[in-house]
Amino acid sequence: MKDVLSRIGIGSATVDTVLPTDSLRAGESVRAEIHVEGGSTDQDIDAVYFALETEYKSDEGYKDAIIDQWKLTEPFTIEAGEQRRFETTIDIPRETPVTTRSTAVEIETGLDISMAVDPGDEDYIEVEPTHRTQAVFDALDSLGFSLHASACEAAAGSLFTTSANFAQEFEFRPQRGEFADQVDEVEIVPVFDDDRLTVYLEVDRNAGLLSEMTDADERHTKLTVDAPDPDAIEPRLADAIRELS
C-alpha cells in the first residue's frame, strides 16, 4: 500500500534546494545544497532536475518560459526516511530577467521518479542585473532618469540575436537634469549576443519599444556596451536621447 501511495505523491521522497542567498546576479554562479529526504518507502531516483523559470506577456496572454534547465546526479535509491545532501553549482544566465515588482524568477527542483508523481520544490529568487546592464542603469540615473516600470514581453525574433523568445523592457522617466522637460520616458531593452551587450533604446513613444520594433519602426537606436563603465556610457546615452527626442 505504501508503494501505491508513494507513486501518487503521498509519502513520497521530498527535495529542497538551499541557496546561500536569495539575491543572485545574472551572469554569475552560486553554490547550492540539495536536500533529498526519503518518504515512507524506498524509491529509485533517476535524477534531480532543475529549471530556471519566469513568465512573459504575449498577444495570447502570459506564458511560462524556461530560461535554463539541467540535471544533477546519476540514478540512486533513497531509502525510507533517509536524508541525502548534494552540492551543485547553479549558473544564472546573463539573459535572466531582473526581478522587479512585475517580474518574478524561480528555481524549480524536482525528483525524476519512474512511474510516480515527481515531487518538487520552488524557490523564488531575486535577480540583480549584470554589471554592464547595471552600468547602463547607473548612467541613466546620472542623466536624471529613474526606473518607472519593467516587463518581460514576446520579442521580435528578427530584430534580436538571442535564443530566447522574449525580452525584458525597462521604462525610465526623467526626474531632473537636461531631459526633465524634453522627454516623457526612455525605454531600453538589453540583449546579450555572445559576450556583447546591445541596448535597444527608444525615446518618448506611446507604444512600447518591443511593439514598435515588431513593426520595424525606425524611430529607435541601439548601443553596444563592452565594459561596465557608467562614465563612458553616459555621454553616448545622452547623445542618443537627444537625437531621438
Regions flagged by a language model, labelled:
Residues 1-70, 74-245:
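Terminal, compositionally biased non-globular sequences in eukaryotic proteins
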